[in-house]
Amino acid sequence: DVDRAAVVTGSGELLNRNNLIAVLSVIVISEHPGTTIVTNSPTTEHLKKFIMKLGGHQYRYISGYRNVINKAIELNNQGTDCQLAIETSGHAAFKENYFLDDGAYVVAKILMLLPRLVAKGETLDSLIKKLVQPKEVVEVRFKIGTKDFKATGLEVIKDFPNWIPKDWVVNLENEEGVRIDFKGEYGDGWL
């Protein structure tokens, strides 16, 4: 039903997840400087810095394509310009396209970007090289085996920050679970 899209670059690199969000961010921020981009929560700090360097803002929200779209609509109604709602899954919706979840529209926007890149001697690959890539990406989902899994999950979320090492930090810019940022001998990252 073409509600999602992914693109393969000239070098064969798959343009999805953070990379797809980065490319679409280049497009919307060039057209709407200072705009906010709503994403779901499992995006990297590298992506946030990439968006900020372009002059935009990222708003991390809970997963679910309808959730990010509704948050973008809400932000616009509150006076915050938000031109793009996108999940790492590839679901993306542009304000100019009535926030429809439309993969074909995403591909069309990227195709329209290509001549501008060529004119500057760039490619999608060179654009993505500007986004720092994580050394490792592992997504783990825990199954809660208790009868009242919701209550157990909420209790774990509440207590988890008490169990982290002192040099790790709770990232408050997160509305889904608990996001912990860490730096040190094992690298920089988040969980």
Q: Over which residues does each language-model region extend?
A:
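Short Gly/Thr/Asp-enriched flexible loops that form oxyanion-binding sites at enzyme active sites
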Residues: D3-L20, L47-K48
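Phosphate-binding and adjacent anionic-ligand microenvironments
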Residues: S11, H32-L191
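Alpha-helical metal-binding/catalytic segments enriched in His/Glu/Asp
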Residues: N18-L24, V107
